[in-house]
């Protein structure tokens, strides 16, 4: 907080809007997001937060979906400035910010790791998706970018979103690796359903219907915790696949 004066930064974004990286994209993204279920969400405050972050972290490219995180933090804190500092800390002190630098190299790494874990732990589902020409990057990208905060608008008890807060606790402790585990748990939970759908239905279900599903409601909390406990993904497996990915990239670079 000592290095950044939020009020001054916001004033700068309004006085010199041309200096805001991705300013036009941010405004467009926020304004077209459907917040109809929550009339209290202040779009201008969300835009202020995202524009300010864009100035403070020019090396991090804004990505569609970050607006959900800003809206989530704004709602749970009730304070625009506090939401800004929390999001700034998220970008600077966790591995989340690294997803959006250097040609999205880290995000691509997690796509690879996720697909390999899916192949190892849920081979039938993996093959079913492959037969239907569905790449995991089609649907897990929003999971990493929004950290599942796109589910927040559909949660009944937003004053105490148990599952989303549990996911964030895990993320703050383990970083983006926790999103791998949550994502695989989601696919495990919905595996029978997914394998009954065709190409278009699968994509619609994974991208649009899961965020609105009972999975993220407080009533599903106990079942979700059982899934997390019983369906473990060893950190050593993730590390081995990350090493595999780095070797693969080195070989490709030498070609």
Label every model-predicted segment.
Residues 1-214:
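Internal, helix-rich recognition cores of eukaryotic regulatory domains
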Residues 134, 184-255:
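C-terminal regulatory/linker segments that are acidic, Ser/Thr- and Pro-rich
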